[in-house]
Regions:
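NTP-binding/hydrolysis catalytic cores, primarily Walker-type P-loop NTPases
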Residues: 4, 242-295
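Hydrophobic positions on the alpha1 helix immediately C-terminal to the Walker A/P-loop
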Residues: 40
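Cytosolic-facing regulatory segments adjacent to core modules
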Residues: 104-151
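Extreme N-terminal, non-catalytic leader segments
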Residues: 1-35, 46-47, 88
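G-domain G4 guanine-recognition motif of GTPases
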Residues: 14, 31, 164-165, 189-204, ...
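Conserved Switch II/interswitch segment of TRAFAC-class P-loop GTPases
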Residues: 142-145, 156-174, 199-202
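Beta-strand-loop-alpha "switch" segments that mediate conformational coupling across diverse proteins
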Residues: 216-247, 255-258
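Phosphate-binding loop that captures ATP/GTP phosphates
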Residues: 11, 60-102, 224
Length: 295
């Protein structure tokens, strides 16, 4: 993956870097497992829905531990079942709390570049015809360290990195940002700190991280805010529900609402698009990445 030649990497950056989605597509990533990425995705989705947005979560988990599970939903199929004719693409979509829609695509989708050209074209056409009117897509990405997962993650208009405290977590998040910037030309990132003890701690970590990334990688890291250490959030996770619904006066609920309010003011992409157009870009990215791997 990291051994692309210059022409191949440039082609992939060109394909995945276009701001063509029109609506907001935000990939939620982390540098390590257990950072709280999935819980952040699920709770942000509910907070956005309560703010009047139509939200779709694309859940890439193939272990049943993604955003669908965090919202109490049980996927019965994934994209591989669609290709096998066991269900339709529309039938994959689950409806969660506050009408948040979840599309559980499964881990097999990350290997879409290895599908036959016929299956790729059919899948792209199916996504184009998908009846899913949304204006915010949150991608709960499986593993940012998995090269096969990258087309889905990189076709977004925004990348949000979830960072818990600790030197190891900071180092791994920095490595993730470095890889995405140097290999794929990503220049802007959003930073959400998780399990933070105080606003002062959050400001210090965010400031140091952003300064280091700007100095050594020449990238911009915008600090979004923080989610506090909150036992009610942990309890909501165990209950497979959102803290926004279960504990409306919890500290973490307040922070998710602030985060959603801030996201509503983010600049909108210049051109219009839809879920189908976004997923077509993902499929094209997977095809090119597989070609690069073989070449």
């Amino acid at each position: 993956m990291d051994k692309f030649n210059c022409d191949q990497a440039a082609g992939l950056r060109s394909l995945l870097g276009l701001g063509q989605a029109g609506f907001q597509v935000i990939t939620v990533m982390s540098g390590q497992q257990g950072a709280g990425k999935t819980a952040a995705t699920a709770n942000l989705a509910v907070a956005l829905a309560r703010g009047g947005r139509d939200v779709l979560i694309i859940d890439q988990s193939h272990k049943g531990q993604g955003a669908a599970a965090a919202l109490g939903l049980t996927p019965r199929h994934d994209v591989m079942d669609v290709l096998a004719g066991r269900c339709t693409l529309d039938a994959l979509i689950l409806t969660g709390p506050d009408n948040v829609q979840v599309l559980p695509i499964g881990g097999g989708f990350s290997r879409l570049g290895r599908l036959s050209e016929r299956d790729q074209e059919w899948l792209a056409k199916s996504f184009t015809q998908l009846q899913c009117g949304v204006d915010v897509v949150l991608v709960d990405m499986e593993e940012a360290t998995d090269p096969d997962a990258l087309p889905l993650g990189l076709a977004a208009s925004e990348i949000m990195v979830v960072l818990p405290p600790g030197n190891t977590a900071i180092t791994q998040a920095y490595t993730l940002v470095k890889r995405l910037s140097q290999n794929f030309g990503k220049r802007q990132f959003r930073l959400l700190l998780n399990r933070i003890e105080s606003p002062e701690q959050a400001q210090a970590v965010a400031h140091n991280f952003a300064q280091t990334a700007e100095r050594y990688l020449s990238v911009s890291v915008d600090y979004l805010g923080y989610i506090p250490l909150d036992e009610r959030l942990n309890r909501a996770n165990r209950l497979r529900t959102s803290v926004v619904d279960a504990f409306p006066v919890a500290q973490s609920t307040s922070q998710f609402r602030k985060l959603a309010d801030g996201l509503l003011r983010w600049p909108q992409p210049a051109s219009l698009g839809n879920v189908g157009g976004f997923m077509q870009r993902v499929i094209e990215g997977g095809r090119l990445m597989e070609s690069c791997r073989r070449g």
